[in-house]
Amino acid sequence: MLKRLKEKSNDEIVQNTINKRINFIFGVIVFIFAVLVLRLGYLQIAQGSHYKQIIKNDENITVNESVPRGRILDRNGKVLVDNASKMAITYTRGRKTTQSEMLDTAEKLSKLIKMDTKKITERDKKDFWIQLHPKKAKAMMTKEQAMLADGSIKQDQYDKQLLSKIGKSQLDELSSKDLQVLAIFREMNAGTVLDPQMIKNEDVSEKEYAAVSQQLSKLPGVNTAMDWDRKYPYGDTLRGIFGDVSTPAEGIPKELTEHYLSKGYSRNDRVGKSYLEYQYEDVLRGKKKEMKYTTDKSGKVTSSEVLNPGARGQDLKLTIDIDLQKEVEALLDKQIKKLRSQGAKDMDNAMMVVQNPENGDILALAGKQINKSGKVTDYDIGTFTSQFAVGSSVKGGTLLAGYQNKAIKVGETMVDEPLHFQGGLTKRSYFNKNGHVSINDKQALMHSSNVYMFKTALKLAGDPYYSGMALPSDISSPAQKLRRGLNQVGLGVKTGIDLPNETRGQIEPLTNNPGNYLDLSIGQYDTYTPLQLSQYVSTIANDGYRIQPHIGLTIHESTNKDEVGPLKKKINGTVLNKVNNTEKEIKQIQEGFKMAFNEKDGTGYVSFKDTVVPTAGKTGTAEVFQNGEPRVNSTYIGYAPIDDPKLAFSIVYTNQPVPPPWLTGGDLGRDVINYYFKQLGKDDKNKDKDK
């Protein structure tokens, strides 16, 4: 019994101890809760307005930061244009940042990086001297201050006079350290509010980059970043076609300001300025990185957050075969130098366009220029921005115009003979200067008969030829009909290529000059681009369908890896028109082109008789003058294989001697045809092995 009472007493003691501890803990909790309630009440009632003001003073700012552009690749995925990353120091000016605060930051930053001071102008130095020495500047303008106060002069006049008084002695006060600060300060001022501005992005050392990164908390608005430059793995090949991108310092070029600002760009954005970079800007530009900065009432950044990491631009794959392009360029370079060494002193341009006639894919677009000293430079853009007299290459278009207007019929025979007109004018063919030869339309193309074309043009004017006749007095209507026929195959109209600055050639009035009308029929009047010639021969090869040429092939999503991303869009060549001719008429021109390159009497036979695949085409020689001396432009157009054309080409050599040293254009066309189809055969064999 006593034992039980003792055990019960011990249990009560333990329970009392537990209860006391629980009560103590509850007491502490109640006390803490009471303190929190009191603190919350204090913050809400006593300090509420203070924190509301802090929130009110805070500002969330979204800033877009530049990202690299998309790559440009050839049709086989070889990278033609890429990005080379480089370290950079940037500055973003806040809404409320003062000039003195910027200057203070510039002074701190100047101790960490070394700037190039070559861009500093005298005006920059004068403005900076005024900012550093406001009292001295004021002392120089005592009289002018009074005049400014009483309205005798305006502020801009005052400023102008102040600048004029700052001379060499004042500017010499600026030390080398001052100039370092100024070099930074001027870049800071070049940017707009909330747009990151490049302070230094050339030759930033790892030491500078690390030093600035460590001091960012003491450098308001300054940041370290990665910038980029375009790099070209194939050197100068197609460099002109690629075009240029503006630098960070340049931003949007003045002449393109309205165009880009209307699309929501900032003035300091890097943009495509020319050719492919400009044409495909919407594709190649990246999605900017979006940063949200929170600033206090003084404009200082208190926190930052990445809203969108951004992405580099999409990749653009071209129709160009870079291996073919390099081969064409090498052949052009070799031939233009050889011509110069053989006495072609005025020879200045050699150009070639290679395309797929079925779909408009441009496979190669090459041009070379040679100056008086013999230096050869690339002139790829000249294939669509420069025009030349092309001679007899156009004769297929002349015959199509004749068929369209019922001036001649398929297979019609005419006599090639010297044509004698009233007033003593005589016109003749080169292959038959004095004889009388009966030829049909196909043979006219094979022999390149001028007379057949002249007689066709006269019939088109409703005035068939007879010896001693006067030339038609009014040729405006037939000239329009002839040009309309040439337009349908791509001569005298823009091709529609996806590149800016294309010319349609030089198309002069023909109202009252019948002699020029006849010259038009043989390619001796209007001028055309090599690209127009390529579209023209492609139209013949493609059974009369004129296809829009294009250099863009596909657009791909960007990835973080080297491989090409998923396909987003395919760029197709559209049918612009079909010539207004029958199938029989088009076949007749194709047969004539075939004969010109494959019959012994054909003008292109010597060069194209032994190509690895059968080739059809037309030659041309245009008479021109250079420095008062007679010269010729040599042209070749063609396609292969004859029965299923996969490649079409045009070649233009300008200002060659009379006669040219050798068949330069023909040799070039033959070599390119052989290279392409031999290479195609190798590729097909490799594909079979892989299966």
Map each language-model feature to its residues.
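Solvent-exposed, acidic/flexible segments
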Residues: 65-66, 98-103, 201-209, 231-234, ...
